[in-house]
Amino acid sequence: MEAVKTFNSELYSLNDYKPPISKAKMTQITKAAIKAIKFYKHVVQSVEKFIQKCKPEYKVPGLYVIDSIVRQSRHQVGQEKDVCAPRFSNNIISTFQNLYRCPGDDKSKIVRVLNLWQKNNVFKSEIIQPLLDMAAGIPPPVVTPVLASTTVAMSNTPGTPVTPVTPANVVQGLPDPWVSQITNTDTLAAVAQILQSPQGQQLQQLIQTLQIQQQKPQPSILQALDAGLVVQLQALTAQLTAAAAAANTLTPLDQGVSFNKKLMDRFDFGEDSEHSEESKKEIPTPQLSHVSESVNNSIFHQIAEQLQQQNLEQLRQQLLEQQQPQKVTPQDSQEGAFGSEHSASPSQGSSQQHFLEPEANLDDSIDIQQQDMDIDEGQDVVEEEIFEPEAKKVAVRSRSRTHSRSRSRSPRKRRSRSRSGSRKRKHRKRSRSRSRERKRKSSRSYSSERRAREREKERQKKGLPPVRSKTLSVCSTTLWVGQVDKKATQQDLTNLFEEFGQIESINMIPPRGCAYVCMVHRQDSFRALQKLSSGSYKIGSKVIKIAWALNKGVKTEYKQFWDVDLGVTYIPWEKVKVDDLDGFAEGGMIDQETVNAEWETVKTSEPVKETVQTTQSPAAVEKETVVTTQSEVFPPPVTMLQIPVAPTVPAVSLVPPAFPVSMPVPPPGFSPIPPPPFLRASFNPSQPPPGFMPPPVPPPVVPPPAIPPVVPTSLVQPPLSMTPETVKDVGFGSLVLPGGSVAGNLAPSTLPAGNVFNPPSKAEPEEKVPHLTEHQIPSGENTRPVIPSDIPSSAPMLAQPPGASNTSGILCVQRPNVSSNSEILGVRPANVSNSAAIMGAQPPNMLNNSGILGIQPPNVSSGSGLLGVLPPNLPNNSGLVGLQPPNVTNPAGLLGTQPPIGPQNLPPLTIPAQRMPALPMLDIRPGLIAQAPGPRFPLLQPGIPPQRGIPPPSVLDAALHPPPRGPFPPGDLFSQPERPFLAPGRPNIDSVPNPDKRIPLGNDNIQQEGDRDYRFPPIETREGINRPPPVDVRDVVGRPIDPREGPGRPPLDGRDHFGRPPVDMRETLVRPGLDHLGRRDHFGFPPEKPWGPRDFDEREHRVLPVFGGPKGLHEERGRFRAGNYRFDPRSGPWNRGFGQEVHRDFDDRRRPWERQRDRDDRDFDFCREINGNRLGRDRIQNTWVPPPHARVFDYFEGATSQRKGENVPQVNGGNTERHAPPPPLPVQKDPELYEKLASSGDADKEESGTAAGVESEAVVESTETEGT
């Protein structure tokens, strides 16, 4: 007995340990038990008592003690001689009743032990099965059956797999092939075995009672056959089937797997086919099926037929009352082994509605009406189920009663896919029509259900989570990896994850020992999660953990919808903001099946509108296609700029040029990929430099009448025949001149010939006609008077006197040889390819929409339309404002040019080189064409309140409005510095009061400065600060000098040498190039040789822009001066409103340089040592203040105002001293002065090279201004 005491003390010491109990402790207890094996009865009793009295959490350790003792005993003495197992089995029922008082979580452990016992034949299956049933809530037969059924039902709620994995349940899930393999002998043996068991005998007795009751025709049968009997039948049947199943070699684990899979299958989670394949592999023994087969075919068939012939109406009501509170009928857990319970499953319609999806409501009424038939026909129903097995599975979703049946169908049903049941159907009494209807339903739903399952399976393979109705699924592709070794590198993670697929990013957080791995595809991340979470994978020395991580794109407000198990954020549709949709995909993906179709339409509506515009005018599209060779289109963000032009909005776009995203190709002026906002578009070797345009190609000829009325660049408000909707559809990229020239887009490509005309009533156009006749303008085509009635209502532009109230009116003379749909409005000289029309402005007092005069001075080489400021009181004016109509007396309303006074003002039409193409820019590559000023700026007059769609003042500064006729490079689009909106511009440039100084119209030899300035800002100014271009760009741009200097072309001097003879210029051109090669001082400009009149000047000017920027670039730039210099002066001024010059004017950085003038009194020699000799120069300038004035005016007779504007100091100190008082430059022509300068400044020049030229030019301009 000492051993027993020792054992007891060991056993009860379990209470001192906190579960789970260690293996060592269990070993000690087992050893003590084996030592006391002689007193095995005491040992067994002690264990049973311990289990009975211990706390719930020690129940399972008590079971483990039983297991350990029994197995050790069997191991030592052999199975036959073992005494412990039989002793434990004597009282095992009560022991397990005590065990099942354990916490709910531990029940699965008890079941696992039972399954192991069953597998290893520790106890007989007859012993184990009731214990398993107890786990399932079915008490052993001694307990009252009714209670049993209730507990079963309560514990076995649908939708959640039953906790215990009992063979009774496993039997339900047998696949057909096994059933078909069963031999008759097996079946008979199984039936015999069942019938011999005590439960089998009870079942036989029950059947006999039923038969006896059935033979007596008394109505009291119903009392005898009460619910308890039926439930007892069920319980017995379940036990029997399970017992028979337990006899075979099915492993408990496999049972669990197959049961779970089959259960899932019954609930139709879409995984069934995969799982059934797995379960077929996992459970190789076909013998289970014979049990259910035999049970169904023999015993229950008889019972079913007997019960079917009785009137069970009252019984059904009884059962309904009993089972109403239960969510599921007891049969749900046992029906697999019990075929007749259809007679006893009356609550199908009502008790399982929680299964139903919304469509179930529709069927409830049918269920209620048909329940009588369902019950009365008992077995019929089963037979029909057999006949239409698969279809019923689908119907499960929509019909509650079919659902319960589909779960309860036994393997017999599955076997009979061959429709073998059709034979039996003939013998049944039932409503034929109902069965036919059911068959139709099932056949219809079968294919759709199969498709749904396949789709679901596909989704699972892709790692996609289940779809929820009216919910957006944002599936994460980001995985959280935890417990990462702190020494692990990104490469370690890459090596681990790249086998699963492409990795988008890895974000490691070493202090926390975790990382976020974002995969490109959801499927890859899903596979990685599956594999890495199942095994113990190490990175470094640590085993990693892995889980789904919320993807970056899901904002905080949506985090509440995150499901970490599925790795998906389920966002209800009503909570989704369409703007956030694109962001959701960051670090994840949007499940397209869950996207609301309405969002797509919302998102695509804007671009669709734009397409309307392009498709509406075939001619316009045709031209665009010819014009542009680029296939890239601007990215969608451009769409945000698009403002539909409603009739109340001025037709000239108030935003920087853009074009509809829907256009097949970008308009000519845009570079294929937009350059950064302030950088010049990079050079494209396949494209000619800006000044060299290919020969004009006439636009395609389209007969006028057939052309739709859409005017792509709505210069004029569309006439009334265009509905506002169509106007809205015109993308406002079309309202603006995207390219460098007016040509392609300024005028409507669809303009019919009849609409472009010169009404004889206007005096000025008639004056113009003589000039035009030089160019063979057929009077019939251009000058025929058109009376409004004879103009088609769709005509986009009509001429009319500016004061008229008509809504249309563009005065223009069409170029004779341009086809009738010519894009050019205005006077188009025949030989000037680049002169695009200048759109006239409406007089300020005009209340009416359009009425644009196109009067172009043909010699304006830049040729783009002048942008003016719309008169403040024009409520709804469309059209670019350019030259003011001759009879408009109030010039102040136009920020533009002086009104032409007649033919004498129109300069000769011969411009040797093409500045800008006048035709649709057919061969011009997008990046190199300067952009027309018009489209760039809102037509705002200073003082007009900003309109709604206007971008911030930094883009639209009124003061920066360029002087007339300058195309600008695309790069300058947004280069304006931030300034107060509509702040006054540079003096003398934007103010209309001195128009005469602005455009010397009649002068043949004088190159119009506005053109030069806008077209080609000097490369220093244009590129030095904002956009340092690669050398080759500069090189190519600079090299082609000769064509630009073509005969008869006005000399393109630097800004300052406006009126100088061309020869001088050319001299200078050659010099600077040498200088920057390092040879300039010694070779190009030998010190002994006196400076040429402008040499000193140019050098200074040139260096200045260089001053503040990176030296390498500037020095290089200087090297190519020789070829380049012609362009520089031209391109520089062209920047007048943009680029560096803008910065010079308005940038704060300029002030320090201006202040240097205050330091002039410093020693002059000190200046030489400074790069660029700034201080030295300042001093010289101050010294020589008086002499320059006369010179300045000599040089720039009419252009002082323009001079000043052009040479606004540039950013970073380039030309900062522009306003410095007197520049020495003009002095150059004075020999004395010049010698002095040369002598004093020689050292400086030697050091600074070209710098001298640049700066002195700047000086001249400032002098000019002060003189003015």
From Swiss-Prot:
Arranged from A to Z, the UniProt key words for this protein are: Isopeptide bond, Methylation, Nucleus, Phosphoprotein, RNA-binding, Transcription, Transcription regulation, Ubl conjugation
InterPro entries documented for this protein? CID_dom (IPR006569), ENTH_VHS (IPR008942), Nucleotide-bd_a/b_plait_sf (IPR012677), RBD_domain_sf (IPR035979), RRM_dom (IPR000504), SCAF8_RRM (IPR034370), SR-CTD_assoc_factor (IPR051485)
Task: Give the multimer and partner information.
Answer: Interacts with POLR2A; via C-terminal heptapeptide repeat domain (CTD) phosphorylated at 'Ser-2' and 'Ser-5'. Identified in a complex with CDC5L and other spliceosomal proteins.
Q: Where is the composition biased (Pro residues)?
A: 961-970
Q: Where is the composition biased (Basic and acidic residues)?
A: 447-461, 763-774, 1009-1025, 1032-1063
Q: What is its main location?
A: nucleus
Residue ranges the record marks as coiled coil: none
Q: Where is the composition biased (Polar residues)?
A: 342-354
Per UniProt, what is one GO molecular function of this protein?
Answer: RNA polymerase II C-terminal domain phosphoserine binding
Ranges annotated as biased composition (Basic residues): 394-443
Q: What is this protein called?
A: SR-related and CTD-associated factor 8
**What is this protein for, i.e. what is its function?**
Anti-terminator protein required to prevent early mRNA termination during transcription. Together with SCAF4, acts by suppressing the use of early, alternative poly(A) sites, thereby preventing the accumulation of non-functional truncated proteins. Mechanistically, associates with the phosphorylated C-terminal heptapeptide repeat domain (CTD) of the largest RNA polymerase II subunit (POLR2A), and subsequently binds nascent RNA upstream of early polyadenylation sites to prevent premature mRNA transcript cleavage and polyadenylation.
Residues bearing PTM Phosphoserine: S273, S617
In residue numbers, the region (Disordered) covers: 322-355, 385-469, 753-808, 947-1063, 1199-1268
- Residue positions, PTM Phosphothreonine: T6, T615
Q: Which residues form the signal peptide?
A: none
Provide a GO biological process annotation: positive regulation of DNA-templated transcription, elongation
- Cellular compartments annotated: Nucleus; Nucleus matrix
Q: Which residues cross the membrane?
A: none
Composition-biased stretches, type Low complexity, lie in 1249-1262
Higher taxonomy = Eukaryota, Metazoa, Chordata, Craniata, Vertebrata
Q: Which PANTHER family match?
A: RNA PROCESSING PROTEIN LD23810P, SR-RELATED CTD ASSOCIATED FACTOR 8
GO CC, one annotated term: nucleus
User: Where, per the database record, does this protein carry Asymmetric dimethylarginine?
Assistant: R915, R925, R936, R1071
